Amino acid sequence: MNISNSQVNRLRHFVRAGLRSLFRPEPQTAVEWADANYYLPKESAYQEGRWETLPFQRAIMNAMGSDYIREVNVVKSARVGYSKMLLGVYAYFIEHKQRNTLIWLPTDGDAENFMKTHVEPTIRDIPSLLALAPWYGKKHRDNTLTMKRFTNGRGFWCLGGKAAKNYREKSVDVAGYDELAAFDDDIEQEGSPTFLGDKRIEGSVWPKSIRGSTPKVRGTCQIERAASESPHFMRFHVACPHCGEEQYLKFGDKETPFGLKWTPDDPSSVFYLCEHNACVIRQQELDFTDARYICEKTGIWTRDGILWFSSSGEEIEPPDSVTFHIWTAYSPFTTWVQIVKDWMKTKGDTGKRKTFVNTTLGETWEAKIGERPDAEVMAERKEHYSAPVPDRVAYLTAGIDSQLDRYEMRVWGWGPGEESWLIDRQIIMGRHDDEQTLLRVDEAINKTYTRRNGAEMSISRICWDTGGIDPTIVYERSKKHGLFRVIPIKGASVYGKPVASMPRKRNKNGVYLTEIGTDTAKEQIYNRFTLTPEGDEPLPGAVHFPNNPDIFDLTEAQQLTAEEQVEKWVDGRKKILWDSKKRRNEALDCFVYALAALRISISRWQLDLSALLASLQEEDGAATNKKTLADYARALSGEDE
């Protein structure tokens, strides 16, 4: 029988294809596979190159890849490589173990970005994965923004976590959640994300659920809840290089006799004080090679996530569910000096302190519920201003609160370190939709204020509340005064949300409608009320009030302190909310909006208050100053864009 070469080649191809399904590579752990195959792409890594598992990552990755551990929770800070670990383990599951995998991120946008900047470059840069993706770089039904289907028959899905439909229909072996704390508590009233998502793995022979996140607020944080449901909470213990005693690294504080310590105002002096024998440990002295994770509840431990031991040292079966905690102090991607610098920047700013606790320490933030500031005490904190605009003020912003029968505006001046001065109070009575009322608001917006040297300053940016009235009124005024100068806003009472989240694009009405994190702003403002400057010395974050009853009086102080934090049950969960108890709070709202205007200037136009003030102080002559200040106002309000 004659067989052509082409027929032989086709036969060889089909035989190989048939035998390929029978081939099983030599078993590898997740770490072994990642160290041999994983590559960090330039699009999503600080440093492109071959992956090398760090000591504190070893047990976490092997636990993620283990068939014997069903649930893995990772409570972590930033800069510990969690997303990279997760993606490396997913590649291991797809190529080595041939499992169907699914990962959820908080929103559809997050999922699309993760697929574009992390997943697709990873497929490109790992040869064994690329060999399973003949569709790479092409339009193909197996290559979409939500799904990749490989030639070994395995699928990978990457979906947003907001919609309940994204938790249906898929049947997978591995379910993962990145930044779980940012997910909604209740997905369209159908349940928690992990409850819905883990239903997708119930039919698997080797079900796996991986949850990881930087934590948020204590009592309402989903990664905290997931961790509390696990019987094992593991912390990374390292031996003291001097006395040999094991301990996990703690940040500590002034009262604790161990942890990170440094000379005041000198971050470079930082060292770690051993909790056992008060040994002084420098960062470069620690050796994590033989460090191990120890459960603070049961005492079980592991070095590599494969072999597990009881507190007495006897080998035991791997746990069904386990939680790991890891934070920045262990990371080679930062220094203890930088950690201390970051801590020092949080002084006087609760929002920054919360961010530090969450993203540097990897701990939940415990919101403090306290009494309101005393309005009568605050009303006595009046100061004599040397001019309508005090010398240390570099920039003016305003907040406008909308009511049906009036508009209220407060003008605030800002100096280095966000030190602030109340400059003006304007209450414009009249129907909110009457043009004559709005013309008087226009006059208030365009009012100028004088410095001691005679230079006049205009309000650089204004945030105008759209709540409670027809928002198109504010939209039209934004277009009239400049889209970047007058910014329509809406409040978002979500704990931890940034003070201002200005969109990059205009909405369908042609304006930059901006969400304001009112809870975050109020907490920062209340914390700043506690700062008391000494004499005329600068104090970052301090708040100043003028000895002028037209601008500041007891009524103003009462409105600034009208709200308090209370615990309320919302949808079956306890939450901490700001409540005015029906007290008037327009002054506080205006302060929030003025702070938001400042933050927009800093984040969008890189406003540097220190540099701007230095430039203003160098100017001589009123005429020169007027011209220069007008230029500053135009540039910093975005009119030159």
Curated annotation (Swiss-Prot):
Changing residue 76 to A: Complete loss of DNA packaging. InterPro entries: GpA_ATPase, GpA_endonuclease, P-loop_NTPase, Phage_lambda_GpA-like, TFA_Chaperone. Residues 573-584 are annotated as: Basic. Mg(2+) binds at residue 401. Changing residue 179 to A/Q: Lethal; very weak ATP hydrolysis and complete loss of packaging. The record marks 46 as: ATP-binding. A motif (Q motif) lies at residues 42-51. The keyword Magnesium applies. Changing residue 497 to R: Km for ATPase increased to 68. One of its GO terms (biological process) is viral DNA genome packaging. It catalyses: Endonucleolytic cleavage of DNA to give specific double-stranded fragments with terminal 5'-phosphates. One of its GO terms (cellular component) is viral terminase, large subunit. Residues 401-586 are annotated as: Endonuclease. Changing residue 84 to A: 40% decreased velocity of translocation and 95% loss of DNA packaging. Inhibited by NaCl and KC1 at concentrations higher than 100 mM and by glutamate at concentrations greater than 150 mM. A motif (Walker B motif) lies at residues 174-179. Pfam families: GpA_ATPase, GpA_nuclease. Residues 1-48 are annotated as: Interaction with the terminase small subunit. ATP binds at residues 491-498. Its cofactor is Mg(2+). Changing residue 349 to G: Lethal, 89% defective in cos cleavage; 90% loss of DNA packaging. The active site is at residue 179. Heterotrimer of two small and one large terminase subunits. The catalytically competent terminase is composed of a tetramer of heterotrimers. The tetramer forms a ring structure large enough to encircle duplex DNA. Host IHFA/IHFB induces bending of viral DNA to facilitate the assembly of the terminase tetramer of heterotrimers. Interacts (via N-terminus) with the terminase small subunit (via C-terminus). Interacts (via C-terminus) with the portal protein; this interaction allows the packaging of viral DNA. The N-terminus is involved in the formation of the heterotrimer with the small subunit. The N-terminus part contains the translocase activity involved in DNA packaging. At the N-terminus, there is a high affinity ATPase center that is probably needed for the packaging activity. The Walker A motif of the ATPase center is responsible for interacting with the ATP phosphate and the Q motif governs force generation and the interaction with DNA. The C-terminus contains the site specific endonuclease (cos-cleavage) and strand separation activities required for genome maturation. This is Terminase, large subunit.
